[in-house]
C-alpha cells in the first residue's frame, strides 16, 4: 500500500502526493495538519499516557482522522456563528497552531 501523504515530525513539513485532488485532498491535508498540531503542541506524550503502548499509533491516527472527518464541519459552524470574521480568525488560529 502506498502512502498519499506524510508529515515529518521534526520539521512539521507535510508531503502530499501530486495525485491528490478535491475532497480527498482536503481530507488528507486536514489529517496531516492534525499530525502537525500533535507535534507542535507536544501532545504525543498525552496520547501515550491515555492508551496502552500497543495502541499508540492507532490513537494518534484516530485523532488525525477525527480532525480530517469533522474539521470542515467544525470550521463551518465557526463560520455560521462568526460570519466573515471566521475567515480572518481561522487562518490566524491555524497559523498559531502549526507554527
Describe each PLM feature range.
Residues 32:
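Walker B catalytic acidic pair
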Residues 25, 55, 92, 97-99:
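Compositionally biased, non-globular sequence tracts
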Residues 35, 63, 96-99:
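Intrinsically disordered, low-complexity segments enriched in glycine/proline and serine/threonine
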Residues 48-92:
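Post-HExxH zinc-binding segment in Zn-dependent metallohydrolases
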Residues 1-25, 36-45, 56-60, 69:
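Active-site scaffold of zinc-dependent metalloenzymes
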Amino acid at each position: 500500500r502506498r502512502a498519499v501523504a506524510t508529515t515529518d515530525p521534526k520539521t512539521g513539513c507535510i508531503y502530499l502526493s501530486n495525485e491528490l485532488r478535491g475532497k480527498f485532498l482536503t481530507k488528507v491535508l486536514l489529517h496531516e495538519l492534525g499530525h502537525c498540531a500533535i507535534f507542535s503542541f507536544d501532545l504525543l506524550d498525552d496520547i501515550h499516557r491515555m492508551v496502552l503502548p500497543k495502541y499508540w499509533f492507532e490513537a494518534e491516527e484516530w485523532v488525525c482522522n477525527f480532525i480530517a472527518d469533522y474539521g470542515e464541519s467544525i470550521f463551518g459552524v465557526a463560520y455560521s456563528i462568526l460570519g466573515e470574521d471566521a475567515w480572518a480568525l481561522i487562518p490566524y488560529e491555524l497559523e498559531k497552531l502549526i507554527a
